[in-house]
Amino acid sequence: MKILYDYQAFDMQTHGGVSRYFSELISHLPQNIKTDISVIETNNIYLKALGKEPAGTLYKNFLWHKDSAIKHFIYKLYYNIKNGDFNRLDHTPAINRFESIKQLKEGDFDLLHPTFFDPYFLKFIGNKPFVITVHDMIPELFPQYYACDDIQIIHKNITIPQAAHIITVSQQTKLDLCRVMNIKEEQVSVVYHGANESQYIPNENDKDFEYILYVGERHLYKNFNDFAKSCIPILKRHKELMVICTGKPFTDSERKMLKEYGMENRFKHRFVENDQEMLDLYHYALAFVFPSSYEGFGLPILEAYKAGCPVLLNHASCFPEIAGNAAIYFNMNKHKNNFEEQFETFYHLNGTERKELIKRQEERLKRYSWNKSAKLSAEIYQRFI
């Protein structure tokens, strides 16, 4: 059995949940399954770790090594004509897309697992089956944050109904998918993410202050603004406490908001270079707080569990499904916000109670394995070949 994975997620992300999911899945599949990834060059950190060339290699080695306008012009002309993209002769060639189409036409695979929802492959796949993974239904459930002609929604409505089978990463996502898109339940299987199985050894802590950790994006449904506002009385009460945020730097509007709250010096942004650094941030945090209204799975929960970091979660979406009794829950919605109260309850746990919480997290983490995820995915592939 040979599975073809296309380029989409790896062109979209240098790192991140979707591309990490596919790199872990591919790396953990049973040995009797052959795989191919239709990517020639990439800046995705997970694929580079698997030996793929960095983006720009093809251009660098084209004709002569020195960059120039004439070299760039000939490069675009050559590869676009070579791949029949006559309407885009002045565009930088979509090298990985061309490679995907080439491999689809050659047909040397048994099943395609596209890594996102662009339906470009449908006219090249012939009678070969494809399986697709739905990571969340955020654009459909929060349309107020997306354009009415959002391309992801359009692509999902074309691609998903034509799949031989659909994988979702949580039961919550399956329920949302079936309800919103009128998909039959038997067409969908739930395959959870796995946890990073490498040994984690903390580096020495260089922080001389306690901090709450916020991880990832901060746009609207993530509830960052409400979280920041809820932190005001907490930070005033606990003078030594800070909030560290990863992800993109604070926007102008976020900096303005924090300044209005008098909290601009209590919220710090931190760039994270690698998994070790991220796990260290979790490990030395007082707690990891995830106030989001909706996630497809919530991979940072498992990261925090692995690092031995107490987890506080909004009681929403798939969080109770994934975290079980190994987290402290609060409500942060338009009807109720008791984050401050629940944080103070956590803050005043004694040593024994905190150890019990961490022990529950360690036990919960054992449920999530990339080997198990890959085995279940392989069984799904086999059903449709």
Describe the residue ranges of each PLM region:
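Carbohydrate transferase catalytic cores enriched for Leloir-type hexosyltransferases
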Residues: M1-I385
